[in-house]
Amino acid sequence: MSFRGINTTVIQIRRQVFTEVARMAYANVKGEQANHLMRKIPYTIIPGEEGKLRKDIFLERAIVEERVRLAMGLPTRRMDEHNSVVSGLEDASIADKYYDPPLVNVIKFACNRCPEKLVKVSDLCQGCLAHPCMEVCPKKAITWESGRSTIDQEKCIKCGRCATVCPYNAIVKTERPCAAACGMGAIHSDELGRAEIDYSKCVSCGQCLVNCPFGAIADKGQIYQLIQGFNRGDRIYALVAPAFINQFPSLASTGKLKAALKAIGFYDVVEVAIGADLCTVDEAHDFLEEVPEKLDVMATSCCPAWSMMAKTAFPDLAKNISMTMTPMVFTARMMKQKDPTARMCFIGPCAAKKLEASRRTVRSDVDFVLTFEELAGIIEGKDLDIDLLEVDENEAALCSASAAGRGFAQSGGVANAVANKIKEWHPDMEVKIASAQGLADCKKLLMLAKAGKYNGYLLEGMGCPGGCIGGAGTIADPARTAIQLNKYMKEAPFTDPEQSPYMSEIHVLKDDPNFEL
């Protein structure tokens, strides 16, 4: 399970790191002054002389150092080489996107070396006469010793059948949390039993980092570089994903959120749901043109973790992923058309968007990517007094987006929006859809599609449980966010994406003068 909505120690440290990196960036110093501030951060977050979290204050500070480096876009350091925490800082002190792959990293000495899978008899065993656990074990790995069941770990295949039949729930089946959360099977153990990521499988969804109870996994960020841009006076737009609802309780209204974003340095604020409206119409056109004449099935393109998984794990289906631009790219490209010298920062729930923004075809549109959690750190680091923020009621709304566009933030929202648009154009046409959330279920969906079970369908995949509202960069409990999102959808100025005042620009953004609604 993830810990969104629960203020755990791991989450507190992660957010403190974001806050202190932001404070350092706003100080706007270079050279040795910057080095001093960076070296000071671990002592600010882990004060005193005694360790309280891992009983080793030096280890605790060393882990924070690696988190600080990653938050600034810097790589983790090798454990077998001497390297200062400030190594590479000068290269990172720029107002541009900065990090090299890999995006998601294991801090090796923070890893607890959890067993990959374990089935174990607990003290709750009553030593019952029936001992069904022994009877169902296919490997005869369970024996009777000292009046209770005992599992021979050498024979056990971790099937868990014994745990299922135990009437006292005395047998526990556990799995390494990060690996259990990874729908790609990309996490295994290294030679020392520490978690290791297979980057040939990883799609940077970030679910491992929010499910690790020891906070041993973190992704790289651009907090430092973004604020360098603010300090330089760059005109930077905040492109806010619709999943922002419920993430910032102190910024309950869109007006407050907009005021806060401008106060920390953004030039203006735009809701990415306007790009979702354009995406809906474009993807509906794609489906009508491609299925079934050219393609047996078509899959949506909005979630980068889903589309990357489809292309790497199912290369034969790569052509079935819609070529429609994602809402992030549609919105960024539109704003750059309006303000060519401005820069764009996507703010959303997603770690994988950082990877999407680094693609050759996208990097000229999107300059920075922040998660909601990183944004919370920046707001804290700026020392904003939320109560004193003045809201201009004439500019309180983010933009004009449809209910359907805002609904992209939850599982099923994309497919339903596209299907409803097709039905509106062709009332007699049946549009069959199927959706999955979480990469493990997404893989199952594509396996069935490959087997021909979904011919004629529109498939939607969301890499995170619940969709974007369950993304790795969110703060709030996804279930509560879903409730607030549905309220926000009802407050939209219109329901139909084609009513968007930006729809007339779609042919320009697609660079297709022949595109017609």
Language-model-detected regions and their locations in the chain:
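Extended, highly charged accessory segments
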Residues: 59-62, 66, 84-90, 97-102
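Gly-rich Lys/Arg/Thr-decorated short loops/hinges at beta-loop-alpha junctions or inter-strand turns
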Residues: 112-120, 143-148, 189, 207, ...
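A secondary-structure boundary/capping signal
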Residues: 121, 152, 198, 240-241, ...
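Iron-sulfur-associated redox domains of electron-transfer enzymes in respiratory
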Residues: 1-82, 219-517
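N-terminal [4Fe-4S]-dependent radical SAM core
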Residues: 93-122, 139-140
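Iron-sulfur cluster-binding cysteine motifs and their immediate structural context
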Residues: 130-153, 161-198, 203, 207-222
